[in-house]
Each structure stands twice: as structure tokens, then as C-alpha cells.
Amino acid sequence: HFSALNDTLTNRQTCIIESMCKMYSYTGDKEILQKAGHIWDLFSMNGGTKDNEVFIHGDMVSSKPIDVHGVTAAEVSKQPLILYLYTGRQEYLDAALGFYSSVERENELPDGIPASYESLFPKHAEALHETCDISDFIWSYGYMLMATGDVKWADKMESAVYNAALGAINKDFKALQYFSSPNQLLATEKSSMAPYGEEGLSRQAYRPGFDVECCSGNVHRMFPNYISRMWMNGDEHEIVAALYGPSEYRTEINGTKVCITEDTSYPFSGKITFRFALDGAPVRIPFTMRIPSWVENAKLTVNAEQPKEYHAGGFSTIERRFKDGDVVELDIDMKPRAEKRTDAGINVYMGPLLYSVDIDENVEIIKDQFKTSVAFPAYNVTPASKWNFGLPENPEITVVNTGKKGFPWT
């Protein structure tokens, strides 16, 4: 199949490169990898092809502003990243770094996903993003993390999942928004700020389906793309805790089965406990944990020994002979922070979470419209309390811990 492909592909057709590289990893067939690189080189290098929308190599490297469908931006731009992982060619990584620098500078909203009214759009206070883009940029950020080892991409993945992704779906996963916004006041069948005709007016409401079905078919990728990067591997049996959340990791090292259980209420708490269970003799493991870039300081303790302090924005490694029953505790300092944005907004964060005003809601349940049913209804949501508040540039923020535990999204 791959050998029969045309060498000249256009835009999202080049996404087959990801599958070609994966097949190479299974087979070791160098011709597949060479053809994948050749397809991208023809498409992007030396001026690219005439059908290339925004992926000319020189434009990507120079971080030129981008005007293209958001999904196309996320899915095509990760192809040089994947090629870099398999070939080590620096020019592939340079193209992706320049491209995502432009997305961050021109388009990225407070929840980690770029503004996209189908096409990428300049960021502003009321800007929207398509739910497809949430899934796809999380996917691409995962490859950026693999390629660069830079914690900023893990930070973006957490921001996108814990804010944009979970804000765009209902708790029961039966309804979603086509367009969502960090600064949204209405979610009704007539409220979309990017209407795309009469049928498109409902795209900011929570519904099981829309006039087009791309987001309903793509939303399932959000969490697998996150979970598949929570635990990663390095060289020499290195185990990397890259993204945080309750989880379990199992592997085998030199004949010893190792299970690491991560206990945490992150992102609501910075206390993360890793419990090691081994079924045999102690084994030497480089165990690496991410220290997010928003942290002022973090403390790391092994078996309740004297803690060590770490600073923000890197990966910290403990290399030791781990034995059954060992406990590693990471305490990430979560302090509220107010960040002023270039679009005149002020965002309030604590840890990876973007905070908002708690607004009372009026909820109308719709069961008799096209693509709705009793089992899968749609919802019109409007505010039932005041929402029009402003913040000073340097607000004083007090954290009140109510003692609640668990995850409010489920």
C-alpha cells in the first residue's frame, strides 16, 4: 500500500506519514521511512508544492502567521515532528518549532488551544476554538514533548485537557460543543458567534450532534492522547512521569516486574505519591518526574527522607535501586497567579487550572430536535446570575480549601 502511494501529496494527505513511520517501527523497512521523508520533502522543502497551504519549510521555520483550517494545522504540522523522531534531521524539528511558535504567539487562548473559527483566528477575549482542535492539538503537543523533552508541551497538554477538553463536553460524555470558548456566556441553539448559516447557530450549545459530525467523531481522541503520554520511557530503563493524574504503570526490568501506582487528586492538589511494587530483587531505575513551568518550587521525598527542592520548568531524575514498598512523594507548590494577556484580558490560574466565575445556570433540556433523543438530549444553557465582573490588574487572591475531594467532571 505505502509503496504504491504517489510521491506528491497535498496538505492532510501527508498525514499518512505518521502511519508510514509507525509501520517502519514495526518492520524496519527503510524504504517506507525513506518514502515518508521524500513525500514531506516534496511537499514542503524548496518552495513546496503549489497545493501547499501554509507548510512551506521556510515559512514554518520563520514562524510566519498561519491562516489555515485549525485541524489541518494540528495534523499536518506534526508530520515533520514524527519524521524528526525517526530520522534525527534537525530541519524537520526546526519547521515544527517555528510553526508552533506562531500558533502560540498569534492564536493560543488561555486554556492552551488556539482560536479557530474553522480556520485559525487571532486571539481575543471572546475567541472560540473547535472541539476537533482540542483533540488534535493535544495529539500534536504529545509529539512535541517526545521530540523536544521540553516541559512546556506537557504543560500545554495538561492545560488543554483539564480546561478546554473537559469544558467542551458534558459529564456523561453524551453531549459536546462544536465551538467552545474560555469566555463564554451563552450555550444555546442560537448563540454561536461563528454561525456558518442557520444550522451552524447551534454550534456553541451542548448537543450530541451538529450540522457536521467532525467534532462528534473526534472528541473520543482527547483522553487517549493525554493518557498515552502520562508515562513515557527513556534510555536505560528510564521511567518518566510526564503528565499527572491517578494512574498505574507496569513494566519488567531485568526479569523483575515493576508496578508504580500514582495516587493524587491533581490538578486540585500538588501532592503526588508514587508507590513502587516489585515482585523480585531491587532494580536500578532512573525515575524522572516533570516539574511544571508554573511552579515556584517543588519538594521531592523518598521514603520520608529529607526532602530535596527543585525549581520550575524541567525534568528531575532519581536514580537508585528501587525495592518493593518504596514511596516517592512529589509536592508541587500550587499558588494562584493572575496573568495579563496581550488581548487585554486577565486570567487566573492555580496549577494547570484556569479559573472562572461561578455563574448560576438556567438549563433547558431538548429531546425532540434533529439528532437528539431522550437518551441523548441537547441543552440550552443561559446565565441565571451576574457574570459581568472585572478584575484589577493585580488582584489579591485568597485560596479557600473547602475539603472537597474527587473530580467534578465525572
PLM features: what roles do these ranges have?
Residues 1, 23-37, 84-97, 104, ...:
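Structural helix-adjacent loops and short alpha-helical linkers that scaffold large soluble proteins
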Residues 1-2, 34-53, 95-112, 159-170:
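Long, well-ordered core segments of solenoidal/helical folds
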Residues 5-52, 60-63:
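Solenoidal tandem-repeat scaffolds enriched in leucines and small polar residues
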Residues 8-25, 68-85, 129-145, 215-226:
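Well-ordered alpha-helical segments within folded domains of soluble proteins
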Residues 36, 96, 155-163, 168-278, ...:
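C-terminal beta-rich recognition modules with glycine/proline-rich loops and embedded aromatic residues
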Residues 145, 150-154, 279, 292, ...:
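Carbohydrate-binding surfaces of carbohydrate-active enzymes
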Residues 282-302:
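Beta-strand-rich binding/interaction modules
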Residues 306-312:
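Short beta-strand segments within Ig-like beta-sandwich modules, predominantly Fibronectin type-III
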